[in-house]
Amino acid sequence: MSKASGKRLNQYVKDYVVFDLETTGLSPETDEIIEISGIKVRKGTVIEEFTTLVNPSRPIPYSATRINGITNEMVENAPLLKHALNDFLTFIGDDILVGHNIHNFDLNFLRNGACRELGQSIQNDYVDTLSLAKICLPQLPRHRLTDLAEHFHIETKGAHRALNDCVMNQLCYEKLGLLLENAKENTAPGQALPTCPKCGNVLLKRNGKFGAFWGCSSFPSCRYTKNA
């Protein structure tokens, strides 16, 4: 069975499922999924959540538990991957998938598991917010999910548990979407995104008391403005 995938989209979409996995390690060939979570979004509003632990049928290494906090005792009575994946694929349907670093990590685990356990391929189109963040916020020294959350003043408590990461990722994606839409409306085709000369963040065009102006997207940490 082919592991063929959908297209990667560097854009904002209004309807999507943001998802995240926790695993026993970094290799989709030799490591296992131990948690799957997803949040279904319609027109920017969360309408449904999915989350489950997964029994990997092998001990979870301490190196994984140290990162995500998931222990062997927690997954002892959890569903096996075959059943968890079947439920998750039903949840996502043919929605566009959104996640952070999913192009290189999560989707490889998902495709490998679906092929091995269910004989299915996952062909949903997807948006990787890591790629999108590098386009929208090139000035950031790092583009981890927690880096984006801190940049946008979004709570990072509970990071590295799948559902918490989904919540954080969804909020960050909506912020990135605002940057993209603003840039699309206020720059000519092929023109670079306008950036703040003080901190390097993208400038957003806003309407103020005295008319339109450009303001830094990192407000209130940076209060740079200029006339539009």
What are the residue ranges of the model-derived segments?
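Conserved non-catalytic scaffold segment of RNase H-like nuclease domains
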Residues: 1-111, 115-116, 120, 138-143, ...
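Short cysteine/histidine-rich zinc-coordinating motifs and their immediately flanking basic loops
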Residues: 208-213, 227-228
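Short alpha-helix plus adjacent loop in nuclease-associated cores
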Residues: 126-143
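Short, flexible, mixed-charge glycine/proline-rich loop motifs
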Residues: 179-193, 206-209
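Acidic, divalent-metal-coordinating active-site segment for phosphoryl/phosphodiester hydrolysis
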Residues: 161-174
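Residues immediately within or flanking Cys/His clusters that coordinate Zn2+
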Residues: 146, 193, 213, 219
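Short metal-binding segments enriched for Cys and/or His
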Residues: 220-228
